[in-house]
Amino acid sequence: MGSSCLPPGFRFHPTDEELIEYYLKRKVEGLEIELEVIPVIDLYSFDPWELPDKSFLPNRDMEWYFFCSRDKKYPNGFRTNRGTKAGYWKATGKDRKITSRSSSIIGYRKTLVFYKGRAPLGDRSNWIMHEYRLCDDDTSQGSQNLKGAFVLCRVAMKNEIKTNTKIRKIPSEQTIGSGESSGLSSRVTSPSRDETMPFHSFANPVSTETDSSNIWISPEFILDSSKDYPQIQDVASQCFQQDFDFPIIGNQNMEFPASTSLDQNMDEFMQNGYWTNYGYDQTGLFGYSDFS
């Protein structure tokens, strides 16, 4: 039976319990399966990429099911020979117990991964396989000799590993132009650092000028120009009548020559670059030369 014999829209997605309880058990006991969708092949004679062409199911299902007889690695042993032409299947993890609705164990599922090359230096691939087998005590008298002769294998290829890169959204705390007259937003969070800084809105600039109408002055400090204040006048007169002696700093014998006129001095300065009564050194400093 091939995939062309399947009705349109047919999909084969059985559960682990259905695979063991119905398909594998009926195959081992020699009972008829209503729809033959699982072929019997020598699975380990093919590499995994050759198996889709051996399946009765459409390739678009991306899962392929096969009955396979156990090929013992050693005549008196229990290990299965799982080597192929280009590599080998390697078991990973522990066998999983498959239970029925009544919670009784009906079989086991083994997970295998295909490695390219020869053991133990093969390269791991994306091909995986689930191998189903019945329990050792789940037998009938008529199928005693057939017990363990078949296993059911589900082969699939994992998709490429997807890296789910989550972009962390940085909450923006800007509240520019919120309708308030202050012109200040709350705070702006920097996208590169965990720092915050105050932010001034250009739409509502903060004015540095002070409105004099908003300044409150106590009436006690307001003077009436129509009245006389003798206390203030006495204090002012005492300040102006007091003599202050300021010491003369530097050379007290220093005398400045009398200048003829401001125009003459200015003409002399424009011609020479300095007044003749002052000396000019290379440091760019002026020094008076007629000290007495």
From Swiss-Prot:
SUPFAM superfamilies: NAC domain (SSF101941). Disruption phenotype: No visible phenotype under normal growth conditions, but mutant seedlings are hyposensitive to growth inhibition mediated by abscisic acid (ABA), and show decreased resistance to dehydration stress. Induction: Induced by abscisic acid (ABA), dehydration and osmotic stress. Residues 172-191 have a biased composition (Polar residues). InterPro entries: NAC-dom, NAC_dom_sf. Keywords: DNA-binding, Nucleus, Stress response, Transcription, Transcription regulation. This is NAC domain-containing protein 96. The lineage of its organism: Eukaryota, Viridiplantae, Streptophyta, Embryophyta, Tracheophyta. The gene is NAC096.
